[in-house]
Amino acid sequence: MSDFVDRVTVHVKGGDGGNGSAGIRREKYKPLAGPNGGNGGDGGSVVFVADRNATSLLDYRFMPHRVAGSGTMGLGDNKDGSKGEDLILPVPCGTVVFEARGEQGKAKHPGAQLADLRHEGDRCVVAQGGAGGLGNIALANKTRRAPGFALLGELGEERDVILELKSIADVALVGFPSAGKSSLIAAMSSVKPKIADYPFTTLVPNLGVVIAGDSRYTIADVPGLIPGASEGKGLGLEFLRHIERTEIIAHVIDCATLEPDRDPMSDYHALENELALYADKLELPLGAIPIPERPRIVILNKIDVPEAKELAEFVRPEFEKLGLKVFEISTASHEGLKELNFALSALVHEMREEVANREQAEEEARVVIKPLETKGRRPRRADEGGSALEFTVERRELGNGEVFFEVRGVKPERWVMQTNFDNDEAVGYLADRLAKLGVEDELRRKGAHPGDEVRIGRGARMVEFDWDPTISAGAEMLDGSNLGARGKDLRLEELDPRTHRRSNAERRAQYHEMMDARAAVRDAMMAERKAGHWADPTVDDDRHDETSLFGHGESSEDGETEE
């Protein structure tokens, strides 16, 4: 099995965010000191990085499933969870990342291009990690001072991507099968490709580094092309993409072929036609030179054969009339290789400068609008408002006549994932958020009634429930209610002196009530004094008669009250 793999499908998943904590602070003499649950850690992301030491995508064929680290849950004492570790995956320079499209269980095909990792260090985040859930200390506010719940961490992004390697070489050797391309790259570099005397010996591209004095450049040996390669015939369509990144195209022509209806000029025009058809389908990167405009050279091979030598001298003027540089070589005797080597080196140096100038000019001409920088992947505020444009509500009807309402939107779907439906307070908090966003108003506008089925999200993350409209976003809006707002612990309210602060009117009313009580006591004492209770020594102080402050008359021995 070849160790060269230039296309693979990889399943990537970002790490899940950690759950928030719903801890309650406990101290000596303060059994209920308020919330102190920390936030969950964010999940790690899956990142592809262009690495010059990577040469193939073979590792991803045997290990196609890659998952980043998940964040840990928050803890009490306001301790946040740790962030999941990012998964850094090296790929060869020249790798293009595509979105994979296709039905589940079937072969995927490339969709939209996500990134073009052409240079060393280029990065692409293909699966974002999930955000950690907020702890109850982050959910607290002036009306919800002791939340008994926390938010769950979000799931990491999960998707299939296709990695496609397009070799980055300075020179591409193109030609018919058995034209001597592999022999040429073996003679000019240290690469040892498979060489045999039958067509299509080369099944994968070979890259070799060639040294010419103080400079060096790379050559790509592309498998043999035949007429119809741009439409998928032979092996050409699989490897024509390796020509996209080369700046110079070298036609290797076999002057010793014995096949009928073939000659150097017809071979050249046939291959040029295939390259032109393939170039029409390409979307070139920034600063790239279109394939038809790239410089060409013609290499007439196998001149060690006398008949081939004569044919090369005969067709050379025809190629020169087309403005092409022609080199006569023999890979067997190494004749003409030195001249070819230094000529290619000079041409490569010239093209590198031209490409650099093109990229700089294109970059300066672009208008870049930078978005506002925000810390984190989303606002850390719990009660996020919004407008109706951030979600959609559609009325759906099933085949059996049942009707349901489908809610789609980034915020509603994320809030559903963050909610622990085993906690009634968390469910009520979700209802408040949806009402504040305007979901309930939109449901009413679409004709929804209490008890109708509502679905939020899609796929495995979808949540179904019977709609029960809230009352002005919760109990905290009900004046005079003893229920308290969601997240309000009445035990804490009793311990907080701020909740018992009296108004001036209440202070005046309490003062007048106290003064009236004192006046009543003074009047009772004056009545006892006038009755002589305090001046008569024969009166028992413990006796309670009708003149006493607490007396109601004294009973006689026969049970009758004395007058």
Swiss-Prot record:
Residues binding Mg(2+): S182, T202
Residue span, OCT domain: 383-469
PROSITE patterns tied to this protein: G_OBG (PS51710), GTP1_OBG (PS00905), OBG (PS51883), OCT (PS51881)
CDD domains per UniProt: Obg
Binding site for GTP: 175-182, 200-204, 221-224, 301-304, 330-332
One GO cellular component term noted in the UniProt record for this chain: cytoplasm
Entry's EC annotation: 3.6.5.-
Coiled coil: none
Localization annotation: Cytoplasm
Cofactor(s) listed: Mg(2+)
Gene3D superfamilies registered for this protein in UniProt: GTP-binding protein OBG, C-terminal domain, GTP1/OBG domain, P-loop containing nucleotide triphosphate hydrolases
Main localization (coarse): cytoplasm
Region described as Disordered: spans on this chain: 529-563
Highest taxon above the source species: Bacteria
A GO biological-process term: ribosome biogenesis
Domain Obg: 2-168
Family that this chain belongs to: Belongs to the TRAFAC class OBG-HflX-like GTPase superfamily. OBG GTPase family.
Protein name per its UniProtKB record: GTPase Obg
